[in-house]
Regions:
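RNase H-like nuclease fold core
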Residues: 5-97, 102, 106, 110-114
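Residues in the helix-turn-helix
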Residues: 2
Length: 179
């Protein structure tokens, strides 16, 4: 089988998957994006954004809800992607988890204005430690943030967060920028 024929078949199957109804109710979507090099039909290679939606089903299982290759994380692309999930049956969401990217935030607020949102813990830690110049300090701050998330109660987490904020007052301003 030729590569072009295999690609056509794969594209058809992928399109069918992207348009099928969701397998069961999703209450907690996790939205993310990654950047990939993509070869176009004219053989040029361009940077593209892969928008990804994962879901946590009522059964507790995780699944990939959808993916879309776009030019950027602009609001228009995220909005189109979120609307495609609605067309496939996503509704009654309890919480959306994602990074705080400007385009995603605007699209999320436009498409799901009343659904609560939580910033992704992984991205929060990444963004916070990106402002820290030394690797040893990065790991320390990463662990401190993780401790906040791992507290058994909200009040314990708030106390731990206050300690973390106080501890950053002794650090350079660039270190505090990510928190």
């Amino acid at each position: 089988m030729q590569v072009s024929r295999a690609t056509e078949m794969l594209d058809a199957e992928f399109k069918k998957w992207r348009e099928q109804p969701l397998p069961e109710p999703i209450k907690y979507p996790l939205l993310d994006a990654r950047y990939e090099k993509v070869r176009r039909e004219d053989n040029t290679v361009v940077d593209c954004t892969l928008l990804i939606a994962y879901g946590i089903m009522e059964s507790g299982r995780r699944c990939v809800l959808g993916v879309s290759v776009e030019l950027s994380e602009a609001e228009v692309h995220w909005r189109k992607f979120l609307e495609s999930l609605i067309a496939r049956g996503i509704h009654g969401l309890k919480l959306i988890v994602s990074d705080n990217h400007v385009g995603l935030k605007a699209a999320r607020m436009s498409v799901f204005p009343s659904v609560p949102w939580q910033r992704c813990q992984f991205h929060l830690q990444q963004n916070a430690t990106a402002h820290i110049p030394r690797k040893s300090m990065q790991q320390e701050v990463h662990n401190d943030i993780r401790d906040v998330f791992n507290m058994p109660t909200r009040s314990d987490a708030e106390i731990q967060l206050k300690k973390l904020i106080r501890s950053t007052e002794k650090r350079p301003r660039t270190c505090r920028a990510g928190l």
